[in-house]
């Protein structure tokens, strides 16, 4: 599909976002092998066509973390972390079920973005860097102090 798109359009794509990698067909026995193979192929495609590829993956969390705690690379492994140049995470402290409603309301627009993996290895801002989230537009912006 990506190769056909690249051939059909004069203006090359600069960014490709894939929301659900597991929906792409691959012929392997295991889901993990399928995802790892697709991740490698996407990385090669990205280099050959000089295009950024972003793969989104929603982490399934247990009841202990309803989306309010920082992530680490062991959360929701899906097979392509090893191939990724960067792994980003995000969470919303207001999702914490143990805080009172007033605190939850005060944190409603708080979203934390994490760099869990970079090209040089470890993460940056493991607790997440605070950003402003607009629930009406879905836009995330940096908080300036």
Regions found by a protein language model. Name each.
Residues 1-16, 44-49, 61-145:
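C-terminal regions of RecA-like/P-loop NTPase motor modules
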Residues 25-36, 63-72:
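Flexible beta-alpha connector loops of hexameric P-loop NTPases
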Residues 52:
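Residue-level detector of anion-binding/catalytic polar loops
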Residues 55-58:
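Conserved H-loop
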């Amino acid at each position: 599909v990506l190769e056909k798109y690249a051939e059909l359009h004069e203006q090359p794509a600069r960014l490709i976002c894939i929301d659900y990698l597991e929906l792409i067909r691959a012929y392997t026995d295991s889901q993990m092998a399928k995802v790892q193979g697709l991740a490698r192929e996407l990385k090669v495609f990205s280099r050959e066509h000089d295009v950024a590829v972003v793969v989104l993956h929603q982490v399934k969390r247990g009841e202990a973390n309803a989306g309010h705690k920082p992530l680490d690379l062991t959360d929701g492994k899906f097979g392509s972390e090893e191939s990724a140049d960067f792994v980003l995470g995000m969470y919303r402290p207001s999702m914490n079920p143990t805080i009172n409603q007033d605190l939850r309301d005060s944190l409603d627009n708080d979203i934390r973005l994490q760099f869990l993996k970079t090209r040089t290895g470890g993460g940056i801002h493991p607790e997440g860097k605070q950003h402003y989230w607009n629930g009406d537009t879905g836009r995330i912006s940096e908080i300036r102090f």
